[in-house]
């Protein structure tokens, strides 16, 4: 795999991590949303990653140093709804309360969502750094060619 293959992998990871950060931010923003267009509380969403163009390790290992093998990348296979039931809170004066006075709130833990958001941010930063390093290697290679 060449430098451009490395850049393609990191670029796909940037896109996937950006989407994960957006979904996590939406979860945080709607942590107290008790009424949606569907009538119930907001449902937490989760991003599922998948490997695209993945090859078995032995195939990649045998092809080391050649550009014939397409680079693998990461993609988002789907965004799924969390199946955790809503948290019921007793609030008899709330307009969204049921007959017993309970309101269904999303099963979202803001602390774990913040950890997920920080994780997505760090992964994004690392992939951006990998792209910068690959660009710097290409630039230095061009500089070497200019001097010869």
Regions found by a protein language model. Give the residues of each.
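Amphipathic alpha-helical polymerization modules
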Residues: 1-148
């Amino acid at each position: 795999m060449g430098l451009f293959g490395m850049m393609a992998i990191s670029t796909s990871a940037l896109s996937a991590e950006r989407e994960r950060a957006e979904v996590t931010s939406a979860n945080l923003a709607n942590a107290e949303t008790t009424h949606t267009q569907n009538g119930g509380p907001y449902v937490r969403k989760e991003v599922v990653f998948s490997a695209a163009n993945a090859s078995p390790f032995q195939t990649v290992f045998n092809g080391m140093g050649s550009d014939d093998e397409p680079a693998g990348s990461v993609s988002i296979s789907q965004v799924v709804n969390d199946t955790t039931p809503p948290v019921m809170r007793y609030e008899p004066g709330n307009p969204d309360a049921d007959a017993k006075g309970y309101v269904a709130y999303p099963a979202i833990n803001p602390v774990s969502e913040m950890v997920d958001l920080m994780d997505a941010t760090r992964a994004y930063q690392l992939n951006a750094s990998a792209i910068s390093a690959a660009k710097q290697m290409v630039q230095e290679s061009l500089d070497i060619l200019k001097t010869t």
